[in-house]
Amino acid sequence: MSELLLELFSEEIPAFMQKNAEEGYLNIFTKIFEENEIFAKVQVFAGPRRITLHATHLPKITLPKEEEIKGPSIEAPETAINGFCKAHNVSKLELPTKLISNQLYYFFVKKTEEREIKEILPEIIIEAINKYSWAKSMFWGDYKIKWIRPLRNILCIFNGEILPMQFGHLTANNITYGHRLTDNKKLEVTDFEDYRNKLLENHVILERAKREAIIKTGLLELANSHELIIKEDNRLVEEVVGLSEFPIVLLGKIPQKFLELPKEVLISSMRTHQKYFCLFDKTGNFTPYFLFVSNGRFTNAELVIQGNEKVLSARLSDALYFCKQDIAKTLESRLGQLEAVTFHAKLGNLREKIERITDICNYIAPNNKDLITAARLCKSDLVSEMVWEFPDLQGIMGYYYAKHEGLNAEIAAAIKDHYKPQGLSDNVPSGNAALLALADKLDSLVGLMIAGETPTGSGDPYALRRQALGIIRIILENKLELNFNDLINFSINLYKDSSDENKNLIISFFEERAKFYFKNDYDIALINAVLDLNLIDTNFKLDELKEFLIEDAGKQLLNAYKRASNIIGDQKITGLVDASLFSTQPEKELFEVIQKISPEIIDSIADKDYKKALNLLSSLLTPITSFFDNILVNDSDPKIAQNRLSLLQNICELFDKVAKFNRL
C-alpha cells in the first residue's frame, strides 16, 4: 500500500484557528478520498506554521466504474433532450432508456477508466485545499490563491517521490523547514517518518496532542515544585499550544512595585495580553509568580525569563500609569463623557441608557439610595483609560474607583457585578447588584428588540438570548417577586416606540427563553401548563405539579380532567349548574365537593400553596370516577344534559385555576 505526505507551509496561522483546521481538513480529505473510492487512513496535524496531511493504505490504482446519470423522459421537449446530450457529448441514439414509474427516461452511462492513483491525487489535493473555509482568509501579492496566511511552500511526496503538483504559484517539492527561531533551514525528506524525525531534530513537535501534553505536564510540575496552584484554563492552554512548535514551560515573577495594582489588572495583563498563567497559593490567594510557555530551545533559561519579565513590566507600567490617571477623576465627573459613547444607533448614547437604568431601578426598589447611586455610576469606567486598554475589566475598575472615592461596599459591589451573569456557568449577583444587573439587562433587551435586533436563527449579535437567561436566573436565584408584565411595560415606555406589537414581541421572546431555561428539568408540556411572567410562581408550580403527576392519583385525576374536557369539546357552555335538576346521587356528590373545595383552592392559590391546591383537586377523584361510571352525560332530557355539561365545565375551570391542564 502507498503513502502520501502533504505539508502546507505558511506564515503564522492564528492559534485559535488551528484546531478547527485540523478537524476540517481531516473531514474534507477523508470524504473526498471516499468519493473517489480511495479508502485510506488519514491523519492531519496543525501547528503555528504548517498543516500536514499523512495518508496511508492508498491503492496504487483506482478501479474502473460505471455511473448511470438520469436524463429527461423520452416525452420531454427536444431542447431538454438535446441539452442533456450536449452536456455528455453523445447523440440521442446512443442513450439507453429505462422504465421508471411507467415512464421511459434517457440515461447516460459515465465510464471511468482504471487510473494510477498518483495521476488523480494532484486534482484531489487541490480540491480539498480549496474546500476548507477559513473564518477569515486573504490574498497576497499578485497571486490568485486565497488562504488564511500567505503560503510559502508545499511539500508533497507520494511513495518517496515528489508528486508533480502546482497550487497557484507554488510547485510541490520535498522540502520543509525547522523551528522558525532556532533551526529555520531547509530539510529534505523522503517519507512521513523521515519528515517527523527531522522536524523533531530541528525543534518542531508535529503532533498537537504531544505539545499540549508537554505544556500541561510542565505547568503542573513547575507549579507543584514551588508549592503553588495553577487554575485550570483549557482555553489558554489551547492557545499557547497553537503558538509554540517546541514548548518549554518557565516561571517568572512580577516586580514588587506592580503589586499595588488590582489583581484583576495583573491577571488580565498576563492572561489576555501575554498568554501567561497566574499562580495562587494553597489558600487561593494571588501570588506574584506566573508561568509562561517559551517557544523553542535556549541555552540560557534565566535570560528568557528576564526577557518575559521585562515585557510584562512594560505593560504593567502602562497599567499603573492609566490607573493613576483614572483616579484623578471621579466616576460622577465622567458622566458627561458617556454622551459621546453610542449605545446603539437607534437608541442613543450611554448617558441616556444610564438614565433609563436608573428609572428602572427606582421602579423596582423605590428609595434605595445605594442602588440609584450605583445605577448612575455603573458605566462611568467605560470611559476610563484602564477599561479602554483592558475591556474585560469593565465593572471591575468601576468597583475599585468607587472604593477609592470612599463609596460604600454595597455601591462598589453593585457596579462590579452588574454585568453578571454572562453565561449559564457564571455566578448570579445578589443584593443591589442583582437589581442593577436586572435593570441593565432588561433595558438592553427591550431597547434592542425595539430597534429590530431580535435574534434570528443562529444570529444573535447582541447576545439577547443570554441577556434574557441572565434576567431569568437573577429573578429565580434571588427569589424576586416581580410583576414582570408591569416591569416590561415600564421599560418599554422609557422608549419612544412603545407599541403593543413591541410589547408582545418582547414577552413572547422572554417566554421562549424561560421555556429553554426550564426544559433541562421539566417536560415541555408541564412548562406550557404553568408558565407565566411570574417566574417564582412558575418554578413553584413546576415542582409541585411534576411531583403530583408522578403519583397514581395525579395520573388518574389528569385522565378524568381530559375525559371531562373531551366531552365538552368545542361546545360553549354558558349556563350555571342547577342543583334542582340533579336526579342521581353521583352528580349531587360531585357538585357538593366542587362547592366545598372551590373557595379553598382559590385561597391556596392566593397563598401560593400549590401543593395544597393540587391535594384539594385530588378530593375530586372519587366523585368524578363515580360520576363517569354511573351517569350518562347526554341525557335524553336536554335540560339535564346541559346541566351535566355545566357541571363538567365547573370541573375544568377549577382545574385550570391551578394550571392549564389542557396542555398536559
UniProtKB/Swiss-Prot annotation:
GO terms for biological process: arginyl-tRNA aminoacylation; glycyl-tRNA aminoacylation. Its EC number is 6.1.1.14. GO terms for molecular function: arginine-tRNA ligase activity; ATP binding; glycine-tRNA ligase activity. PROSITE patterns: AA_TRNA_LIGASE_II_GLYAB. It catalyses: tRNA(Gly) + glycine + ATP = glycyl-tRNA(Gly) + AMP + diphosphate. It is an enzyme of class 6 (ligase). Pfam families: DALR_1, tRNA_synt_2f. Keywords: Aminoacyl-tRNA synthetase, ATP-binding, Cytoplasm, Ligase, Nucleotide-binding, Protein biosynthesis. It is found in: Cytoplasm. GO terms for cellular component: cytosol. InterPro entries: DALR_anticod-bd, Gly-tRNA-synth_bsu, Gly-tRNA-synth_heterodimer. Its main location: cytoplasm. HAMAP family: Gly_tRNA_synth_beta. Belongs to the class-II aminoacyl-tRNA synthetase family. Tetramer of two alpha and two beta subunits. This is Glycine--tRNA ligase beta subunit.
